[in-house]
Swiss-Prot record:
Superkingdom of this protein's organism: Eukaryota
Family under the similarity heading: Belongs to the glycosyl hydrolase 17 family.
Gene3D superfamilies reported for this sequence: Glycosidases
High-level lineage: Eukaryota, Viridiplantae, Streptophyta, Embryophyta, Tracheophyta
Annotated knockout phenotype: Embryonic lethality due to division arrested at one-cell zygotic stage.
Name under which the protein is recorded: Probable glucan endo-1,3-beta-glucosidase A6
One Pfam family this sequence matches: X8
């Protein structure tokens, strides 16, 4: 009997082990399948900071027309989420930065957020990611940053309470979360955020099988020093390579360098297998005169090559993680004319507000790169050298110009001195002329303090001198 019992026990243990191994393999297979599915659907960022943008209904139809597979919202807009229930699009929603502290403080508040922003729409609306905040570590917001992971954890708790397990929670970070990123193997997170934020964040993401979301823009890395990095290398079309001296890994584009620097930074903190997702990447189609390389051809080239790379089957991954599926969101659907900052901030879109393309792009990645209509060659791929002025845009509203004129002249005794009666720029006496001088003078005087030639859309830069023999407009020399 004892021999028989031992025999039966052995069979039971063996079969149990086999079943456990089979279940584990099945779980791993389903995880991999989900990762491949998410990565195969190239997404689009749908921002709405513009006064000329179409309705959510029209915008979602435009998203379907470009064959995007996933849409990322910068909020949880009820109208958009309702409309998206009638599509096959995967959806990502965002918790605004200002709500993070409240969510972190109380599970009830997080439960209410989920009850309001997810439960009425899910699963008919195929929500796949909830992103808590946006680039929260790029701002000097210590209290908010330490509340980041607790807020994420409470949202996951609420999702689990409702039996929802396939919505992943993450947070998009920018490249400035790194202290060093070159060469890629030198990637290291900033010391002041490593202990308080990064380690808890990575532990949370790893424990929930979520992704490290990254807003990564090779344009800014390249444009800061365009003479040191080939434009073709930044646009995925160069034959040049870079070899990391520490690892021997060979890089053929700038994006892979930047992604691997983050992967190496996570490895140094003990997370070598963390999933990676690109929450924003793109290239501006226009910018200020000193924003070299911001043009339609470069934007089209970058995004077409990006989609080709990221939609490849099997996945290409990066030199340090070959074969890694990376869910990717192109930035962005429209130009957003109410964004502040330099000109490029308002010009990342692929569509005009009427839905017509700024340039053609195929989000399935199936169109060969030679299959698109030719685009005009740019003239700003090398830095501009010369004088620049700031003048009102054609058709600028006179009432708004007058208000901005008063603001500019109030900032300094010298800004508008030449506009005093009898002075060299007093005539002709008109709001447009006086505003032209005042805005330009103010911009030239304070440009080194990050004043932009924008003034809520009233002004733009020009290389044509707006002054005359009597009235000399101050200029900025690039």
């Amino acid at each position: 009997m004892s021999l028989l019992a031992f025999f039966l026990f052995t069979i039971l243990v063996f079969s149990s082990s086999c079943c456990s191994a089979t279940r584990f393999q099945g779980h791993r297979y389903m995880q991999r399948k989900t990762m491949l599915d998410l990565a195969s659907k190239i997404g689009i960022n749908y921002g709405r900071r513009g006064n000329n943008l179409p309705s959510p209904y029209q915008s979602i139809n435009f998203i379907k027309s470009i064959k995007a597979g996933h849409v990322k919202l910068y909020d949880a807009d009820p109208e958009s989420l309702t409309l998206l229930s009638q599509t096959n699009l995967y959806v990502t929603i965002t918790v605004p930065n200002h709500q993070i502290t409240a969510l972190s403080s109380n599970q009830t508040i997080a439960d209410e957020w989920v009850r309001t922003n997810i439960l009425p729409y899910y699963p008919q609306t195929q929500i796949r990611f909830v992103l808590v905040g946006n680039e929260i570590l790029s701002y000097n917001s210590g209290n908010v940053s330490v509340n980041l992971v607790p807020a994420m954890r409470k949202i996951v708790n609420s999702l689990r309470l409702h039996g929802i397990h396939n919505i992943k929670v993450g947070t998009p970070l920018a490249m400035d979360s790194l202290r060093s990123s070159f060469p890629p193997s030198n990637g290291t997170f900033r010391e002041e955020i490593t202990g308080p934020v990064m380690l808890p964040l990575l532990k949370f993401l790893n424990g929930t099988n979520s992704y490290f979301f990254l807003n990564v823009h090779p344009y800014f890395r390249w444009s800061r020093n365009p003479m040191n990095t080939s434009l073709d290398f930044a646009l995925f079309q160069g034959h040049s390579t870079y070899t990391d001296p520490q690892t021997g890994l060979v890089y053929r584009n700038l994006l892979d360098q930047m992604l691997d620097s983050v992967l190496f930074a996570m490895t140094k903190l003990g997370y070598p297998h963390m999933r990676l997702a690109i929450s924003e990447t793109g290239w501006p189609n226009f910018g200020d005169i000193d924003e070299t390389g911001a043009n339609i051809l470069n934007a089209a080239t970058y995004n077409r090559n990006l989609i080709k790379k990221m939609s490849a089957s099997p996945p290409i991954g990066t030199p340090s993680r070959p074969g890694l599926p990376i869910p990717t969101f192109v930035f962005s659907l429209f130009n957003e004319n109410q964004k502040s900052g330099s000109g490029t901030q308002r010009h990342w879109g692929i569509l005009h507000p009427d839905g017509s393309p700024i340039y053609d792009v195929d989000f399935t990645g199936q169109t060969p790169l030679t299959g698109f209509n030719p685009l005009p060659k740019p003239t700003n791929n090398v830095p501009y050298k010369g004088q620049v002025w700031c003048v009102p845009v054609e058709g600028a509203n006179e009432t708004e110009l007058e208000e901005t004129l008063r603001m500019a002249c109030a900032q300094s005794n010298t800004t508008c001195a030449a506009l005093a009666p009898g002075r060299e720029c007093y005539e002709p006496v008109s709001i447009y002329w006086h505003a032209s001088y005042a805005l330009n003078s103010y911009w030239a005087q304070f440009r080194n303090q990050s004043i932009q030639c924008f003034f809520n859309g009233l002004a733009h830069e020009t290389t044509t001198n707006p002054g005359n023999d009597r009235c000399k407009f101050p200029s900025v020399t690039l």
